[in-house]
Amino acid sequence: MSSKKLRRVGLSPELCDRLSRYQIVNCQHFLSLSPLELMKVTGLSYRGVHELLHTVSKACAPQMQTAYELKTRRSAHLSPAFLSTTLCALDEALHGGVPCGSLTEITGPPGCGKTQFCIMMSVLATLPTSLGGLEGAVVYIDTESAFTAERLVEIAESRFPQYFNTEEKLLLTSSRVHLCRELTCEGLLQRLESLEEEIISKGVKLVIVDSIASVVRKEFDPKLQGNIKERNKFLGKGASLLKYLAGEFSIPVILTNQITTHLSGALPSQADLVSPADDLSLSEGTSGSSCLVAALGNTWGHCVNTRLILQYLDSERRQILIAKSPLAAFTSFVYTIKGEGLVLQGHERP
C-alpha cells in the first residue's frame, strides 16, 4: 500500500506537482520524511503537515474488515475473478482460470512453453468479455527478448479464427499489448514503480513479467557474499509492488521463473519440486541427493500465490502441474504446443 501514488490519496494536483519536483511521488516517499523536511518541501505549517501525514497514513493503511465484508465486496465487484486460459480442464481445476488480484508464476525449463503461455494469455486478456476475455490492455515486460509480434498474431488467428477474421481486429489486439524490454534489475524495478499510472491511463487488465528470474540470476551471483541478502531484498520489493497492483486494480499478474538444481539432504517442498533425479527419494532426503526446483529460493516461493510448473514428457508432449494454489489440488495435464498456443491432450476446446 505504501506504493500508492500521492495523486490517488486526496492531495491537490498543485501539491503533488510540487512534491514530484523532489522525487516524492508515492506514500512511501512522503512518509519517509520528517515533519521538518515536509515543511520545507511543501511550504506548509507544522499543523498543515501533520494533517497531510494523517491523510497519507490513512490512505496506505488498510482498514480492518470481517470475512463477510470481504466476501460481499468481492461479490459486488464488477471485475471478473479469473482470466480463463481456455484450457478447459485447467480452468476447471483452478476454479475459473488465472486468478485476478494475485500473482501467478509459470516455472519450467527452457523451451517448454512459458513464453507461449504468456503470449496466449496476452491475446485472451484483450478479447471481449463475451469471449471470456477482459477487454483491456496488457503490459508485457520482456527481460529475455523472447516476445514476438508475429507469434502473437499467429496465436490470435489460429485460436480464434472466427473472431480475428479482419485486419482491424488483429490491429486492435496487437495495439493493446504494450511491450517493455527491461534487461536490468534497476530498470525492471523502475518500470514496476511507474506501472500504476500506466494501468489507469491505458486500461490495463493483465501484467506479465517474462522472466523475473532472468535479470535476477544475471546480476546476483549467490556465491558472492551479501548477494543473497540483496537479491531477496530486490525480490521482496518487486513482489510487494506487483501484489499491490494486482490487489488494487483486481487484475491478474503472471510471472515466469526458471529452474535450478537443488543439492541438499533436506527435501524441497512439493510446490518447489519440478523433476526429481533418480537418486532422490520422495519420502526421505539423503545426503548428496539432487532434484530440479523452481529458482529464486523459498522467500520468492512464498511471494507467489499460484505456481504452475511446465515440464517435458518427450519431444512432443509436455506436462503442466498445479504445484501451488489456494483453491486447487495438486494435479497435472498433458499438453502440446501448436499454432494456437498450448493445447491439452484429451480435452477439446469448446
From Swiss-Prot:
One GO term of the biological process aspect: in utero embryonic development
Region annotation (Interaction with RAD51C) ranges: 1-75
Classification via SMART domains: AAA (SM00382)
PTM: Phosphorylated on tyrosine residues by BCR-ABL.
One Pfam short name: Rad51
Keyword Cell cycle appears in the UniProt entry: no
Superkingdom of source: Eukaryota
Chain sites annotated for binding ATP: G108, P109, P110, G111, C112, G113, K114, T115
GO cellular component, one term: replication fork
SUPFAM superfamilies linked: P-loop containing nucleoside triphosphate hydrolases
Expressing tissues: Expressed in a wide range of tissues.
Alphabetical keyword list: ATP-binding, DNA damage, DNA recombination, DNA repair, DNA-binding, Nucleotide-binding, Nucleus
Chief place where the protein resides: nucleus
Location within or outside the cell: Nucleus
One GO MF term attached to the UniProt entry: single-stranded DNA binding
InterPro entries in alphabetical order: AAA+_ATPase, DNA_recomb/repair_Rad51_C, DNA_recomb/repair_RecA-like, P-loop_NTPase, RAD51B, RecA_ATP-bd
Sequence similarity: Belongs to the RecA family. RAD51 subfamily.
The protein's role, per its UniProt record: Involved in the homologous recombination repair (HRR) pathway of double-stranded DNA breaks arising during DNA replication or induced by DNA-damaging agents. May promote the assembly of presynaptic RAD51 nucleoprotein filaments. Binds single-stranded DNA and double-stranded DNA and has DNA-dependent ATPase activity. Part of the RAD51 paralog protein complex BCDX2 which acts in the BRCA1-BRCA2-dependent HR pathway. Upon DNA damage, BCDX2 acts downstream of BRCA2 recruitment and upstream of RAD51 recruitment.
Assembly notes: Part of the BCDX2 complex consisting of RAD51B, RAD51C, RAD51D and XRCC2; the complex has a ring-like structure arranged into a flat disc around a central channel. The BCDX2 subcomplex RAD51B:RAD51C interacts with RAD51. Interacts with SWSAP1; involved in homologous recombination repair. Interacts with HELQ.
Stated name of the protein: DNA repair protein RAD51 homolog 2
